[in-house]
Amino acid sequence: MHDIRALRADPAAFDAALGRRGLPASASSLLALDADRRMAQTRLQDYQARRNALAKEIGQGKRQGIDTSMLEATAVALRDEMEALEARSASLDAEQKSLLERLPNTLDAEVPTGPDESANVILKQVGEPISLPFSARQHFELGEALGMMLFDAAARLSGARFVVLRGALARLERALGQYMLDLHSTEHGFTEMQVPALVNDATAYGTGQLPKFTEDLFRTTDGRWLIPTAEVPLTNLVADSVVDEASLPMRMTALTDCFRSEAGSAGRDTRGMLRQHQFHKVEMVCITRPEDSDAEHERMTRCAETVLENLGLAYRRVFLCSGDTGFSAARTYDLEVWLPGQQAWREISSCSNCRDFQARRMSARYRGADGKVAGVPHTLNGSGVAVGRALIAVMETYQREDGSIDVPAVLRPYMGGLERISA
């Protein structure tokens, strides 16, 4: 949510920020609405003062035995006018909130300007794309040949964009998630959390999924939402609260199922596990002081990179451009991993600094050592990493010509010492 005071202070900058997102200028209409809203509030305060003065005058008159019928009639008329003005003020408040809540976060000045992913900037690359001495197969070809990746069975159970994993591949995916959680909680200073997979409207609103992106979510018949990422419940743990500055930064991590409708992905990645309705992901969330959020963003991104480095996967860090940065983010780094079977770089992690955008939506604050509210914290989130995509990358990177798959050394303790997966 945007701070209306910032809009009042510099409407030109506000419109320029919207322009970078490819959106039309809105400052003038928002300021006109804001002026009407503030005028209604001022008039309402004047009416309240008049009502209080009348009540005092009526009370004094009655104590003195004076006829107060005229004053009482005036008070009744004033009450009716106040009710109409209160309704008008509430309507203007709701209209302003509705307009502001649909506008995306302001991008950092350093974010590259561009219309789509073609304008993203590669910041660094670690490792070279592996070149196998045989024709590399894609993960679904490997998994189906092993009899451990059952797409037809999943389609019978649930429809398209689901998978059933079996045997050693199911264990390998579990090992990846456990390894990531252990790494983040024991070496990276994150507190492991278990969170609900169902959230209410207010929670989905706080992180920016609602009201704009309902088509991307699954909703239950009782009106709750399946989480698209653990970012949603983790970040909202500070909603409607004031946290102590001494407790910041709050670093949390969780491994959850994630659910996405993939409404805008028709025809894309229809084979395999790359784009599914249900998948596992390890998420990292940080709540921090504004002055520390840049350092936390770099730290969080490095935590995700460490996962890929320890798995021996080639990756690159990409700075998302203005047209590719998500609704709630002020800046985002994507990590893309090399998939030998696809001969392509594919996103495996996205790490975002949302500044105070989400915290304002969820009414989060922090207090200093003196007990006074010091300000609005910054929120950050990042994949640490997508477990299914890590499984894909491991399968394609560590495949052998006979279709077997070597298990990366860091995962073998989670696999009972198994070194190779074969039919």
UniProtKB/Swiss-Prot annotation:
Compartment(s) where it occurs, according to its Swiss-Prot or TrEMBL record: Cytoplasm
Pfam families on file: Seryl_tRNA_N (PF02403), tRNA-synt_2b (PF00587)
EC number, UniProt record: 6.1.1.11
Keywords assigned by UniProt, alphabetized: Aminoacyl-tRNA synthetase, ATP-binding, Cytoplasm, Ligase, Nucleotide-binding, Protein biosynthesis
Alphabetical list of Gene3D superfamilies matching this protein: Bira Bifunctional Protein, Domain 2, Serine-tRNA synthetase, tRNA binding domain
Gene Ontology cellular component list: cytoplasm
Highest taxon above the source species: Bacteria
Pathway info: Aminoacyl-tRNA biosynthesis; selenocysteinyl-tRNA(Sec) biosynthesis; L-seryl-tRNA(Sec) from L-serine and tRNA(Sec): step 1/1
GO MF entries: ATP binding; serine-tRNA ligase activity
InterPro entries registered for this protein in UniProt: aa-tRNA-synt_IIb, aa-tRNA-synth_II, aa-tRNA-synth_II/BPL/LPL, Ser-tRNA-ligase_type_1, Ser-tRNA-synth_1_N, SerRS_1_N_sf, SerRS_core, tRNA-bd_arm
Swiss-Prot/TrEMBL domain comment: Consists of two distinct domains, a catalytic core and a N-terminal extension that is involved in tRNA binding.
Family membership: Belongs to the class-II aminoacyl-tRNA synthetase family. Type-1 seryl-tRNA synthetase subfamily.
Subunit structure: Homodimer. The tRNA molecule binds across the dimer.
Name listed for the protein in its UniProt record: Serine--tRNA ligase
Lineage: Bacteria, Pseudomonadati, Pseudomonadota, Alphaproteobacteria, Acetobacterales
